[in-house]
């Protein structure tokens, strides 16, 4: 499943500062109920995102799945793990581990969002 030209905002999950703990008070990710007890290697393998895109599973069914997110303006790509849900109709990418990695020309920061393409991919866990 995939979608193009999807609005991607950013969120300050700060996973490294929160020890990659999905249930930390500063994080309180929706998927913590199911994924907070996963090993650190699993939780820290990919950057984090919230998902509410137009194509793909919702709620618990989306938790732990991976997306290949592409900034079509620059070609920059990254794999991100779904750890949360959102309500913006797209993605809410972690600032540190995902958004800044694909906002290679700084336009996303200037606009407050990126328009991205995403595709569900195998996390290879």
Curated annotation (Swiss-Prot):
Any one of the GO BP annotations: defense response to fungus
Keywords: Disulfide bond, Lectin, Plant defense, Pyrrolidone carboxylic acid
GO MF: carbohydrate binding; RNA nuclease activity
Residues in Barwin domain copies: 1-125
Disulfide bonds: 31-63, 52-86, 66-123
Gene3D superfamilies attached to this UniProt entry: RlpA-like domain
Residue positions where Pyrrolidone carboxylic acid is found in the record: 1
Pfam family for this entry, one: Barwin
Protein function: May be involved in a defense mechanism. Probable plant lectin. Binds weakly a chitin analog.
Protein's UniProt name: Barwin
Provenance organism: Hordeum vulgare
